[in-house]
C-alpha cells in the first residue's frame, strides 16, 4: 500500500530523480523560466520554493544547505544575491506553472515553470 508516500516517482530510481531535480532547479534559477513536462514542473515546485525561502536569510549555514541541495555555486550565488532579496516580502508562492499543450512525439503534457516576479519580456528585448 502506498499510504502517505509523497512525491512522484517519474519512472526513475532515487539517485536519478535527485540528479534530475538538481539540474532542473539550477536551470530554473539561472533562466527563471523553463519548459518541461507537467509532472516534473509540479514536483520541481517542491524543490525550488524551499531553496528560495532559504535564500531570504543570507548566512553561511544557509548557503551551505543550498549548495548541498543543488551542488552548483552559480545557482547558490544567484539565489542569495538576487532571488532572496527579490522575494523578501513574499511569503511563498514564488513559482508559476503555465500549461502549454502536449509534446508532439509522445503527447506528454508540457508546461512552463517560471519565477513570478521575473523581469518583463519588453525589458529583456531592450537589453538584447
Curated annotation (Swiss-Prot):
CC annotations in GO: cytosolic large ribosomal subunit
GO molecular function: structural constituent of ribosome
Source taxon at top rank: Bacteria
Database matches in Pfam families: Ribosomal_L17
GO BP annotations, alphabetical order: translation
Disulfide partners: none
Primary gene name: rplQ
Name of the protein in its database record: Large ribosomal subunit protein bL17
Amino acid at each position: 500500500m502506498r499510504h502517505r508516500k509523497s512525491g512522484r516517482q517519474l519512472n526513475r530510481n532515487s539517485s536519478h530523480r535527485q540528479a534530475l531535480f538538481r539540474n532542473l532547479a539550477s536551470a530554473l534559477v539561472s533562466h527563471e523560466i523553463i519548459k518541461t513536462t507537467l509532472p516534473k514542473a509540479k514536483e520541481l515546485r517542491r524543490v525550488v520554493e524551499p531553496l528560495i525561502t532559504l535564500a531570504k536569510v543570507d548566512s553561511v549555514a544557509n548557503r551551505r544547505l543550498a549548495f548541498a541541495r543543488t551542488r552548483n555555486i552559480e545557482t547558490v550565488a544567484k539565489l542569495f544575491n538576487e532571488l532572496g532579496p527579490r522575494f523578501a516580502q513574499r511569503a511563498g508562492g514564488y513559482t508559476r506553472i503555465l500549461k502549454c499543450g502536449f509534446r508532439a512525439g509522445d503527447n506528454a503534457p508540457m508546461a512552463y515553470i517560471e519565477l513570478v516576479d521575473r523581469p518583463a519580456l519588453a525589458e529583456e528585448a531592450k537589453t538584447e
